[in-house]
Amino acid sequence: MDLGIDGKVFLITGGTKGLGLAAAHALVGEGARVVVSSRNQAAVDEAAAALGGPENVLGLAADNADALAAEQMVASALRHFGRLDGVLISVGGPPTGPITTITDEQWRDSFESVFLGALRLARAAAPVLPSDGSIGFVLSLSVKSPWPNISVSNGLRPGLAMAAKTLADELGPRGIRVNGFVVGSIATDRLKSLESANDDPARARAERTAEIPLRRYGTPEEFGRLAAVILSPIASYVTGTMIHIDGGALRTL
């Protein structure tokens, strides 16, 4: 199936590893060009090389918590490629731990990067996106049900999901679509880190997969393919939707 994105340009934050990098690979594989960002310059350089070099990718070292980063990333995309057709906003997981131990500073820092950083980028990109443009927010099952020991994510991501839904209403008349990805257990470094916090990581994995109807974790590539489809014109009538990719783990509709 031709996704109709040959030559289009997509900006992906958190695009140097995990879900963001998988989405970048899927988009480039369909002929798109990508702008990938990360706070780490070495990670940016490595991802850019893996994605095919300057003809296909622009790598940017940027921090979503920086109030100027969103405008700078959009400007860089336009300067390098001359256009911007879509954005995938993926932000690294905030600190783990129970609410009773998370400090005010941790809450503020996480709000800046996870919540405000995401909305700043959507706000900066919206005016320059074409009528068939698309914005995707990478969220998690904590949008629908709290996960143990990730209280900050449980607190922030549901609000971001509702903001995405609102943005879909606002941008819909221009033809710009906005969707969220409600991501379950995907085999990323972040998930491995959460497992390692347990006394017995192997047991934690066995217990978690036993609760997933498909009895396994998803792969970043499975997410990347879905993200590419939803960001593309193939999904031209899909907006304001929270799309689950969780192996059936969520026990509600």
Model segments located where?
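Catalytic loop of short-chain dehydrogenase/reductase
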Residues: 136-160, 164-173, 185-186
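Short C-terminal tail/terminal secondary-structure segment
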Residues: 228, 239-253
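Conserved glycine-rich cofactor-binding loop
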Residues: 16-18
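Short, flexible catalytic-loop segment of classical short-chain dehydrogenase/reductase
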Residues: 182-194
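Alpha-helical segment proximal to the catalytic Tyr-Lys
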Residues: 127, 169-173, 236
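Rossmann-fold cofactor-recognition segment
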Residues: 53-67
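Substrate-binding pocket helix/loop in short-chain dehydrogenase/reductase
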Residues: 98-99, 103-111, 208
